[in-house]
A protein has these predicted regions:
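N-terminal juxtamembrane/topogenic regions of multi-pass membrane proteins
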Residues: 1-87, 103-106, 234-235
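Conserved catalytic-core motifs characterized by acidic clusters
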Residues: 2-13, 53, 138-144, 217, ...
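Alpha-helical transmembrane anchor segments
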Residues: 26-48, 53-57, 67-71, 201-264
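A ubiquitous short alpha-helical element
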Residues: 48, 79-80, 148-155, 244
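Short amphipathic alpha-helical segments with heptad-repeat character
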Residues: 77-80, 186, 253, 260
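Membrane-cytosol interface motif
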Residues: 84-99, 250, 262-264
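A residue-level signal for conserved active-site and pocket-lining positions in enzyme catalytic cores
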Residues: 89, 122, 259
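Structured inter-helical modules in multipass membrane proteins
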Residues: 97-209
Length: 264
């Protein structure tokens, strides 16, 4: 996450890193270039651009804005739910850290390192990546067979939760913890499982592909045809206004694609 000072409006106006502009700049440059060429050819009487009725573009733009707002709302809800789930993961990990002081210091350290390993494995699962976990090898107290099973497991983060659950059961049977303490710690483990299930649901249920493609194509068609509608009335101001309108629509389209994947 990029943290910036939002109190400085001037700096925010000219921000580049972390904005949507680098993503849409190629398409935006093509639209502005097309508008400039169109204005130049028309002013030199080399070419008379076909006039597209503005009322048609007005209605088209309103409809397109409504559908873009629907898509952006749906994508933002996915992003916000992902943030809430990860916040729940952080809060639950802190609860485990606080409530696990009833365990011996060694068992508590193993438990907390496994919770940390679970978070890292879940992150890698959601981002479809594999980061090295050598840091945890001597800290999570897994046997060689357990490590082999971990790397071969289709859901490594779930495997870690199962190992935590088994250790808590052993601690209960040996009398290290009471059944009340076990239930409290187990509830936190259940909450971690719920977080993973929620993240998996978001990851495996994207917005309908056909819906995204339809809006994507419509936005680009609208932006590339727009100069033909505005050139007759705006003249040399056409590239500027077309660039601003295209930046708005192309930016909203690209922004919704980023929000659709809340896990980076």
């Amino acid at each position: 996450m990029i943290i910036r000072n939002k109190n400085n409006s001037f700096t925010l106006l000219f921000a580049w890193y972390g904005t949507i502009l680098p993503t849409v700049l190629p398409a935006l440059a093509i639209v502005v270039f097309l508008s400039t060429v169109l204005v130049y050819l028309s002013s030199q009487h080399f070419f008379q651009a076909p006039s597209v009725p503005a009322i048609g573009f007005t209605i088209f733009g309103i409809i397109l804005s409504i559908f873009l707002s629907f898509r952006n709302t749906a994508c933002y809800e996915r992003w916000w739910e992902g943030r809430k789930l990860w916040g729940t993961l952080i809060a639950t990990s802190r609860h485990i850290s606080r409530d696990s002081h009833v365990l011996s210091e060694h068992h508590r350290q193993v438990l907390m390192y496994r919770v940390m390993l679970f978070s890292n494995l879940l992150r890698d699962r959601l981002r479809n990546q594999n980061q090295p976990i050598e840091f945890y090898e001597n800290k999570v107290q897994l046997t060689t067979n357990d490590y082999q099973a971990l790397f071969q497991h289709i859901n490594a983060s779930q495997y870690i939760l199962e190992s935590i659950q088994k250790d808590l059961v052993i601690a209960l049977k040996t009398g290290e913890i009471s059944d009340i303490i076990y239930q409290g710690l187990n509830q936190h483990i259940v909450e971690l499982g719920n977080v993973q299930a929620g993240c998996d649901r978001i990851l495996s249920t994207p917005l309908p592909f056909s819906y995204s493609v339809l809006l994507h194509r419509t936005v680009y068609c609208f932006c590339f045809i727009l100069p033909f509608s505005l050139e007759a009335s705006l003249g040399i101001w056409t590239p500027i206004l077309v660039g601003l309108i295209a930046y708005l629509f192309l930016g909203l389209d690209a922004l919704s694609e980023q929000l659709e994947e809340p896990f980076g």
